[in-house]
Amino acid sequence: MDAVSCAINALSAQAPPKHLGGNNVGRKSVTFPKDIWGDYFLKISPNEEKLDSWRVRAKELKEKVFDILSCAKGAEQVHIIDALYHLGVSYQFEKEIEEALKNMLTTYNDDTSTEDDLYTLALRFRLLRQNGFHASTKALNKFKDAHGSFREDLASDVMGLLSLYEASYAGTVDDLILDEALAFTKIHLKAALPHLDSHLAQRVSHSLELPLHKRIQRLEAREFISLCEKDDSIVIKELLEFAKLDYNILQALHQWELKELTKWWKKLNLVGKMTFARDRMTEIYFYVSGFFFEPQYSRGRIISSKILAICSVVDDEYDVYGTLDELQVFTDAICRLDVAAMENLPEYVKPLYEAIFFSLKEFEEELAREGNAYRVNYLREEVKNLCKSYLQETKWLHQRYIPTLEEYLLVSEISSTYTVIFNGCFVGCGEIATKEVFEWFQAFPKLLSDSARIGRIADDIMSCKFEQSRGHCPSAVECCMEEHQCTKEVALGNLDGVLGRAWKDMNKACMRPTPFPMEVLRPIVNLARMAEISYQYEDGYTFSGGKTKERISMLYKDPIPV
């Protein structure tokens, strides 16, 4: 039995908690906003002639960008690599960037000169850290005064401040100087903001709202390309043209995937049969593609989106519709996952059980042709763990029990669906999805736990008001308030500290040497980034008509004019 299952079973087996109340929680009445995309992606037809011409031109430009990157040295090379990340095309030059960063690390850690300005040095540091290289913070000391504080004359170097601000989020718990850097840069960037030109003010405001380290690359690319179109001094012309074409070519692939998923979802008609549930196929794909956008992960995105769409209905079955007795029977059936187990289920929930059972069988049959059917067993176990975690949360609601924060997170990190998402994605991946990777996922390593923790707490902070109004198990906010007997404001401050620590621990876990390559680790961090994005303004999944709709339009609906 895996570590997650053992922990949930242990909690479930505990004697009833002290804070028992009435046990009469019945069905809840909740009306979720309707699906806003409908058949939109079914109707999209790519212009193959235009796509072919884009591919030909992109191939030519890629060679030119390769030459530019290969010839660049020193600070110029640093700026080009940074531009590749901002423009969303770094994945096209991974080997070249890796080699450049290895060389950069040697000169960075050995260099005691004062050649680099604040902007370039902080940028070197961030690029190295975000790729898992242990760049020292000692070089930043040259920007401090005799009293050990950052020099006040740096306040006039806005680009340098912005670069240091972004770099400060790549720190670990041991990097105290980066905490100082964050506080220093925040104060001076906010003070400078009213006096900046519109383009620079936009960049600074954007970063103060959500730092680059917490943004997803694909959205950043769209926004950065738009910024570069307004200011042609930011990047080289050929690089910008290549980024636009690459964006549109990849968008066409994502549109095709959404079309296939929409067809499948409409045919399944699960929400039509279980009308209490949220209908969010497009939003689920947005979430999944946020941490795995590259073309080689197409099948992984499709499989993960399918199982997550079904699990979203499972979530609503536990949260808003099923009675405790029904949910216990459903959980028992899921733990068996065979056709015979369906006989004892209420009629209304059988379509949901069938969707889980037959989708997993479908994945298994597809992967059997490659000799990888064993992967689906790991996904199957995580679906079982997910339902166990949902049931435990439902029991807490019925018992009127408020667990400690750590007790709550032990369960809710699983109910966040992160383990299902990752297993679903890697089930459909290529050679990087080894048995060792699945075993590592099943052990629920700290990196995955921290990512799930960020997702759960970000969700709870934004969602607790709506969820508590309809009857929901306690959120992280309520758990923290009860445990520490504090106000909501104090609890939110405590949780902000938990989030900050989780980010720093993830940064440390990605420092080389690592148990697996960055291709395995980076998506875990990206999922935490998706949580920051999704709950930045509201619960962008449940209420998807605002910023989420705007972002989906940017990513999958509207190509960049070229």
From Swiss-Prot:
Mg(2+) 1 binds at D315, D319. Its cofactor is Mg(2+); Mn(2+). It comes from the Eukaryota. A motif (DDXXD motif) lies at residues 315-319. The Asp-Asp-Xaa-Xaa-Asp/Glu (DDXXD/E) motif is important for the catalytic activity, presumably through binding to Mg(2+). Sesquiterpene synthase involved in the biosynthesis of volatile compounds that contribute to the characteristic flavors of black pepper. Mediates the conversion of (2E,6E)-farnesyl diphosphate (FPP) into alpha-cadinene, delta-cadinene and delta-cadinol. This is Terpene synthase 2. It comes from Piper nigrum (Black pepper). The lineage of its organism: Eukaryota, Viridiplantae, Streptophyta, Embryophyta, Tracheophyta.
